[in-house]
Amino acid sequence: VDAGFGGLRDDRFTRRLRVADYLDLTDGDTTGFFRDDCDHGTRVTRNIGGFSNDTLLGLACKADYYLVKSDLEHGEPREDERRLCRALAWLAQRQVDVVNISLGYTVFDDFDGYTPQMLDGRTALCSRFLDSLLDAHPRMVVVQSAGNEGKNKWRHISFPGDVAEAVTVGAADSEGTGRSGKSGTGYYPHPVKPDLVVYDSPNGTSFSTPVVTGLCAALMGYRPMKRRELIRLLHASGTRSAAPDLETGYGIPQCDTLLGFLDTPAELQTLPLNATQ
């Protein structure tokens, strides 16, 4: 779900991806979907599964892609939040396994009713909707960007990144030991948010998030599992799994650790249950 997929069918890293279906919720245009002036979604998709003959940018290069434009590139009307809900419903109807949302909401041009104190997963419209959708679809995984408010007045993650079973992804600093300055932080101690961080390239949590989306798709392809089990694995593999915090969550997920868990079923039974609390 994004703000535009301009150039996706011409970009050397995304032109060979399998697009199963697509939808424009902003104006209903389908003929010009891939000629959009905005290419934010295309750049995000590169990090999910982009590849060329000699380069692999994302891990989900063999997935089927369902693309939805729900957000306006310029301005922040509250209708963007409503369209996100409709986009998620459309994807759920198509039984999409893993959803990437490199969008997030805090304040709007025409609505100022949200505050950081409302980051409880139960208050914002899109958070309530996503929470109920995930409850109805235990195998659906939604990977949500933490947002780039870390240096702004808001400071914290954006909605719907506060939903307990959304995999909320922030951005790590260049050393991989802390939070990139503008990456949003968690507000409440439980559940820990963001869940994970990844180095962002290009800059911003919009581009760290799809790295984790590609990882989730690859893991689900390797061994299908329910969402809670996947989240528990991701948390347990993180570089800060022993001491998660509101800056970097459970840290950077480690692929070698994840594969070790998957290849040794006994280890799965000993992972801490509080990893998803």
Q: What positions do the PLM features span?
A:
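Subtilisin-like serine protease catalytic core
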Residues: 1-23, 29-80, 94-97, 110, ...
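Short pre-catalytic strand/loop immediately N-terminal to key active-site residues, enriched for Gly-Thr
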Residues: 28-36, 199-207
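Catalytic-loop motifs flanking and including active-site residues across diverse enzymes
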Residues: 40-44, 207-212
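Substrate-binding/access-modulating region of protease and related hydrolase catalytic domains
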Residues: 51, 70-159, 201-210, 247
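C-terminal subdomain of the subtilisin-like protease fold in secreted/lumenal serine endopeptidases
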Residues: 100, 221-277
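Alpha-helical segment proximal to the catalytic Tyr-Lys
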Residues: 169
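Carbohydrate-associated surface elements
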Residues: 172
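Short, small-residue alpha-helix embedded
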Residues: 208-223
